[in-house]
Design a protein with these regions (language model features):
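ASCE RecA-like P-loop NTPase motor cores
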Residues: 1-138
């Protein structure tokens, strides 16, 4: 259960598009990172396929309008929980190879640049260096 005044390490899990990924405001060091697993693409359904077909006929971007933009909006909302004020500091990890595709990277907010693609060992090194740098003045 979530405790408002938790003094210990807390790991929270949420679903993209759920209330935690969109409606919680944890400032300062209350939330120091987000690990986003998957691209947030909505399920295929008749309504979305009609929407996709409509935009494919108009501009050949039906997948983008029906699925991609919706999914990336969820990803950005979840990642946005980490940085709420100018004083906040945190790490955002995107775990899905599809995030390497241009159609996804073009939708990254400017604050996500520069970003780096790493393996698990390099990720551990970078996160340690990131937190060591942030704790120098404390």
């Amino acid at each position: 259960a979530f405790a408002a005044e938790n003094e210990e390490t807390l790991v929270g899990f949420c679903v993209l598009g759920g209330i935690f990924s969109e409606g919680i405001d944890l400032k300062n060091d209350r939330l120091i990172g987000a690990v986003v697993v998957g691209t947030g693409l909505p399920m295929v359904c008749n309504e979305r396929e009609l929407f996709r077909g409509f935009f494919d006929e108009r501009n050949n971007h039906g997948f983008d309008y029906a699925y991609l933009y919706n999914g990336m909006n969820k990803v950005q909302q979840a990642a946005g929980r980490v940085i709420r004020t100018m004083e906040d500091r945190g790490a955002i990890l995107l775990l899905d190879e599809r995030f390497l595709q241009r159609q996804y990277t073009e939708l990254f907010p400017r604050e996500w640049y520069p970003h780096e693609v790493v393996d698990i060992r390099r990720m551990q090194e970078l996160l340690q260096a990131f937190w060591n740098e942030g704790n120098k003045g404390k």
